[in-house]
Amino acid sequence: MVVPQKKFANGKRNDSTKSFKPMKKPFKKTKDDVAARSEAMALQLEDVPDFPRGGGTSLSKKEREKLYEEVDAEFDADERVSKKSKGGKSKKRIPSDLDDLGLLFGGGLHGKRPRYANKITTKNISPGMKLLGVVTEVNQKDIVISLPGGLRGLVRASEVSDFTDRGIEDDENELLGDIFSVGQLVPCIVLELDDDKKEAGKRKIWLSLRLSLLHKGFSFDSFQLGMVFSANVKSIEDHGSILHFGLPSITGFIEISDDGNQESGMKTGQLIQGVVTKIDRDRKIVHLSSDPDSVAKCLTKDLSGMSFDLLIPGMMVNARVQSVLENGILFDFLTYFNGTVDLFHLKNPLSNKSWKDEYNQNKTVNARILFIDPSSRAVGLTLSPHVVCNKAPPLHVFSGDIFDEAKVVRIDKSGLLLELPSKPTPTPAYVSTYDAAGDEVTKLEKKFKEGNHIRVRVLGLKQMEGLAVGTLKESAFEGPVFTHSDVKPGMVTKAKVISVDTFGAIVQFSGGLKAMCPLRHMSEFEVTKPRKKFKVGAELVFRVLGCKSKRITVTYKKTLVKSKLPILSSYTDATEGLVTHGWITKIEKHGCFVRFYNGVQGFVPRFELGLEPGSDPDSVFHVGEVVKCRVTSAVHGTQRITLSFMIKPSSVSEDDSIKLGSIVSGIIDTITSQAVIVRVKSKSVVKGTISAEHLADHHEQAKLIMSLLRPGYELDKLLVLDIEGNNMALSSKYSLIKLAEELPSDFNQLQPNSVVHGYVCNLIENGCFVRFLGRLTGFAPRSKAIDDPKADVSESFFVGQSVRANIVDVNQEKSRITLSLKQSSCASVDASFVQEYFLMDEKISDLQSSDITKSDCSWVEKFSIGSLIKGTIQEQNDLGVVVNFDNINNVLGFIPQHHMGGATLVPGSVVNAVVLDISRAERLVDLSLRPELLNNLTKEVSNSSKKKRKRGISKELEVHQRVSAVVEIVKEQHLVLSIPEHGYTIGYASVSDYNTQKLPVKQFSTGQSVVASVKAVQNPLTSGRLLLLLDSVSGTSETSRSKRAKKKSSCEVGSVVHAEITEIKPFELRVNFGNSFRGRIHITEVNDASTSDEPFAKFRVGQSISARVVAKPCHTDIKKTQLWELSVKPAMLKDSSEFNDTQESEQLEFAAGQCVIGYVYKVDKEWVWLAVSRNVTARIFILDTSCKAHELEEFERRFPIGKAVSGYVLTYNKEKKTLRLVQRPLLFIHKSIANGGGSKTDKPDSSIPGDDDTLFIHEGDILGGRISKILPGVGGLRVQLGPYVFGRVHFTEINDSWVPDPLDGFREGQFVKCKVLEISSSSKGTWQIELSLRTSLDGMSSADHLSEDLKNNDNVCKRFERIEDLSPDMGVQGYVKNTMSKGCFIILSRTVEAKVRLSNLCDTFVKEPEKEFPVGKLVTGRVLNVEPLSKRIEVTLKTVNAGGRPKSESYDLKKLHVGDMISGRIRRVEPFGLFIDIDQTGMVGLCHISQLSDDRMENVQARYKAGESVRAKILKLDEEKKRISLGMKSSYLMNGDDDKAQPLSEDNTSMECDPINDPKSEVLAAVDDFGFQETSGGTSLVLAQVESRASIPPLEVDLDDIEETDFDSSQNQEKLLGANKDEKSKRREKQKDKEEREKKIQAAEGRLLEHHAPENADEFEKLVRSSPNSSFVWIKYMAFMLSLADIEKARSIAERALRTINIREEEEKLNIWVAYFNLENEHGNPPEESVKKVFERARQYCDPKKVYLALLGVYERTEQYKLADKLLDEMIKKFKQSCKIWLRKIQSSLKQNEEAIQSVVNRALLCLPRHKHIKFISQTAILEFKCGVADRGRSLFEGVLREYPKRTDLWSVYLDQEIRLGEDDVIRSLFERAISLSLPPKKMKFLFKKFLEYEKSVGDEERVEYVKQRAMEYANSTLA
């Protein structure tokens, strides 16, 4: 709507004449104006009223308008005069965009009408404006939207919707990309405008898509049918999606269409558009339809009272042309509003200059609202065909495209409209005057003509207009860079410097694009004054570094600009050997980071920098330096590039022996403050670096050695830690050199829970990095590095420290190694730490001697640990005594106070002392004069005259022996100990360990007792010292890992060595042999073939034995690398032949059936595991260990650990080196299976379950088995024979004798002894094994002979395996297999079955065969008939007398007389009468239909049923024909009993809350007999559920049909309402037709089985072929298979039935589905999952509601209430408008005695349609009466009768329920209320009649008369 002419943005009129002055910049707004608009936005975009307060006027409306026109005319005249007079003449100027865009704020109006159409620009857009935009980009944190006028807006992720709980900030990219798509039209609102900091003069437009802002001011009344609204998807439900409109109390909903299309692709948070289809004003729910065609075609209706606030961008309106403007059209729409359309939004985007002719006044068109400005109340419309169709205009061109043949369509004052020949359709383009003529002032009409073809280049795109912006300037076609797509990394181009700042320079290409040259790239060197380097306006040559997010970066470094080397701009371009230029971005100690083009980055390791050893990279390189580098490796997937500054690769050495972990020697070249540089001795000149920390394991010794080393000194043993180019990193640490072969250099060499040596390479706050060989590095987190959680890592370790690391985890995928450095898990297990200290002490002593000769070190040889030495006292002080030695210079002795032994020493005296310790570096000897040391020593002194007397080495001490010691001297690094128990032998122990060097050490005192272990005896490697390990240092006992012995050439595989046993383990002997070699002897390497249970009994620790080395240590396993494999088998030691590795491989060959021996090392519940050899293990399954049950029960006891067990090879897994054994011989030819032996044995056992087992099971085998399942009915037992092999024991093969319950005493999991009777293969390729548990079979009896009872009782125990073994009149026994109404089947053996007809079941009549002959019952009978060809056997179960004739034949008619009263049972009901079995006679009589009743009887079958007990009178006896005529009329029985000959009906008063079965249930009830369980009511759980789906509970009384159930037909007519007579009669007819159809089906199905019931599968196949659409037959077939325990076959029959039954027979198919439900519910594995799968399939083919009800019935009958409740909840959600579903929910709740019924009722009333409320409430009340609380039922009835007091059907049902309860006072009171109503006579007659019948049944004559009197009174009052 166009605003009044002189109103401003705030709506206030300003009468000041200053306000009418011409404005030079009408669009420029002050900061205050913007701030005011922002404030308005913050106040939720409230409109400011025209007159905020006061200011009334006395002028009328017409007078005001006239005054405004006069002022406007005067103002326009003044404006024109002032323009002309200023400067004397008007100036020519280029028309600006502001002139033809039109104003939104009153500056461009002419009279009452605007001169220009409203257009949006950056200068007039303001907060609060609503616009229609199109999504152009979906970024990680925002959305870019193209707005009208070519503007670009941004939407933050937090402004896309009103939802705050979506977690947008966690994963914005995924969320925004899911709910928005490029090209989507969206309505938005302007939040704020920001000045773009990156580009001056541009403003950022921040938008919001929140509907709470767009729909502000809307109310529920604003929603009208047919309107289009935007909404956010709040949640997705089963039936549709819940929508959010941004309004607090209004909810939307979109239902899922039938085809489900509406649901596809819809996601939570998505913004959609929909047409209002339904409005629920009660619940304030608006239903929408999101059909795109409906949304696009929907017009906004012209509603009364619509305000400006209700207009939303995107609305389609019917607009009428009001006038044509200079650059558009003015429309009015919706009666009250005006809007404009500019030239670029016309219907034809390529309109020529005559476009105005197309829009005549009052012409109506469809337009869509483009934008709305609430402040000026201006509206923009669009006629663009695509936007009107609710689609974004397509664009077929791109920025930078050049078109040589663009056609001029129209020439305007502001520019040219062109037609670009794009495909598939032309695209309009507009060229402004500036881009067409440049700075020249010229008229476009003179230069261009319409229809001309010109060359144009696309500058940009306006997506909302579908318009391209072009230029005709020549400069636009010249430059190589015009758009961002033209920019390629590495390209060289010219650019002009336009600005210079402290961060760099901004340059501009010839095409207009801008780029940045960072400060570091302005020169090769550091630039301090960039403005002097770059001059604004200078044109320079640059190289493009990259273009990311339309931001171009360039460089001016000369080396890069002029480089001729290949450009590296992507990781895929990086190939090994590529040489290119880059620049350094970061320098670290371990290398440099180098960057290339487009952000590609690589790393140069330190050894590839080409530095001299000891040089610092920072001193050689600087950040920003351009370098030439070579790619050494590239991993494209992980984007890792490794580089080298050494262009030509060089090898470390030509000597291949130098590799990681090798030992080398070298000569010191130079020494720096941090490292020692050595020249390594090799074929080529190679240098190595030894850091100061790697000179020794002890930190103090390393510093001392560093100070003593000099160039030229030779270092003999150096470990190669790492090879860095042509340099090597070396180490002189003894701990690493000693275990060089064990140090890992690759992930594959690491094994969790092993301990390895390494060194600390770096420390951080969170942990410690430990390095091994090469660059293999692990990390020890702080929690795993120190035992004390409060300790600091930096205070516990130092860089370079030797450590022992426990490998916790190895993650090769992430290349991560997790370590533990805790002393508790990494303590030393040897004395290497203190040993290294003494070795380094010797080395330091040698270094200290200026002349390394023997004479300088010879003094040490004069002293020996523990020997006596003679010396002279030099001086004495508080600490002790200093001693001089004769003929030994510069060596002193020292006796501490503790070791003076109480003697008084004076200077000059001579003493003989014991040597305790020697410090070669300090040239000091520690001595002792303690008597116990001296006295013990003198006992071993010889009588020689030598001054030097030596103690003998104690032979009693052994390695690993634990001893008690006494501290003699406490040194800084070690203790001097004596061992009193072993002659005071002197030993040495370290006070710290590798990992505790920096930690405080435990304080020891002289004389303290400690416990230690002997780790090394005196030898040259220990400097002649006995080395001990303190328990306090090790923390735990010695682990299994010990130091690895060096490999000696004398030890070879096959050599015989002498070894000493150090440890005896359960399955191996640990030995030491040779020079520090360690090995083991496996338990299988002791004896040749003996099965001794204790092979190690003859060995003891310390024993010396001879053994042969049979295998080298396994290098792949770090834990076992130190152990050689040895053997002491006699045959192995005798064999002098050459031994090699081939002998080892021969032991891995095994043949099937081969007998092998192993030793038990593990037993679990199922398997016993054996060690067969060093590398091969075996396992035996529990059932393969014995065939006796009692032995299997004691399985674990029979196989103690270490026992020798033999077995026969069944299978062999060569890959895992595992045998499968059995303990019974296998009957087949031996065959090698080491290489497979066949296709089956190639694979592991698990891959061929059961196949190998069945190959070695034969008929007649006696096996051990375990009962895995007791099958239902007469299915027998399922017995497990192997891990994956099962067999079946037939019901008749369980016991020898015929016992009533063969399964009694058996349980699942029980072990049994069984015999294989038969092995056969099924059609599926699986093996079926028939077993027997009968002890009478050969091999099954535990005694030597059978009992006499079993031998003599052949008839009882015999099993007839063939039909030929049977003959008529032979006595047989068997078990009932299944029972039907026509008879039953019995099983005589596992192969023979027989049929028993109903007439032969019993001597007397059998009323219910299923109950009297249940499945599994033991019966005895006689064979009547045998048909070998058809394999049919008929048996009778009737008993016989002595004469062999039936008892019934012994009776005679003479015993009966005419007139006698007899009792009996109805045998058969015929249309002509009843056949009655007369009790105690066995004879049958006929009662003709004429003799049944005194009245005429139409339908005999409806009144009488077979099996009912009746009384009758004998009317006639025909002895010739042996016929008896009976009569049952009442008159015949008057003199007898009062009992009438009528069926015994059920008590109608005892009603339950169970559904009533339809008539079909009687037929289908026959399936109860086929092996299914029954409930207490006798209803089948599996197949009888077929009828329950159509069942109606007795409480579900249809109130519309209530008359049918409660009254006779005459009463019904009185009760029916007149308006419903036709409808109800139709329903009654339908019900009657349905009942007749069910009866026909029942009769037909009965006839199918009348003549001959199928007895085997072939007969059933014939039957289903003849009646393929009968579900009854198919279900019978399923039941038959289930009776045979063949569940899979029953399933296959169900599947066949579903495929076979015609698709039109929906009821029959549904019957099969329900039977399928019950089948899976009983036999599924697991049942719940199996039923669910079948249920999901059934829903797709049948009526879902019926399927749900059927499954609910299954769950309720099987009392699975949790599943039933879960299903009911789902049903309520899916069918919430179904009354039946809600009633089932209430019925279920009442059954489970739940009290919260009212909440269910309330929910149901909210969901159900109103017309179903009465029915629901009344039936709920009936349920309460019958199953719940009667008072609640009364309350419900009373409530509904208050609303509908004249509904006699409600009164009738209410009365019936009260009558059923039997409270007379309540009933009579209710009747009194009913007959007091004012109802029509017919209804009152019905009530009175019901009252009268009630009183007749329970009352007396007085009450009957009372009712009659009340009826007369009513009749009289009515007639009056």
UniProtKB/Swiss-Prot annotation:
GO terms for cellular component: nucleolus; plasma membrane; ribonucleoprotein complex. It comes from the Eukaryota. One of its GO terms (biological process) is embryo sac development. Residues 1620-1652 have a biased composition (Basic and acidic residues). Disruption phenotype: Aborted development of female gametophytes. SMART domains: HAT, S1. It is found in: Nucleus, Nucleolus. Highly expressed in flowers and at lower levels in roots, leaves, stems and siliques. InterPro entries: HAT, NA-bd_OB-fold, Rrp5, Rrp5_S1_rpt_hs11_sc8, Rrp5_S1_rpt_hs1_sc1, S1_domain, Suf, TPR-like_helical_dom_sf. HAT repeats lie at residues 1651-1683, 1685-1722, 1726-1758, 1759-1791, 1828-1860, 1862-1897. Residues 1-65, 1535-1555, 1605-1652 are annotated as: Disordered. PROSITE patterns: S1, SOYBEAN_KUNITZ. One of its GO terms (molecular function) is nucleic acid binding. The keyword Isomerase does not apply. Residues 128-210, 226-291, 314-384, 400-473, 490-557, 577-646, 661-733, 753-822, 866-930, 958-1031, 1054-1129, 1153-1224, 1260-1334, 1369-1438, 1459-1529 form the S1 motif domain. Involved in the biogenesis of ribosomal RNA (rRNA). Required for the formation of 5.8S rRNA. Required for normal development of female gametophytes. This is rRNA biogenesis protein RRP5. The lineage of its organism: Eukaryota, Viridiplantae, Streptophyta, Embryophyta, Tracheophyta.
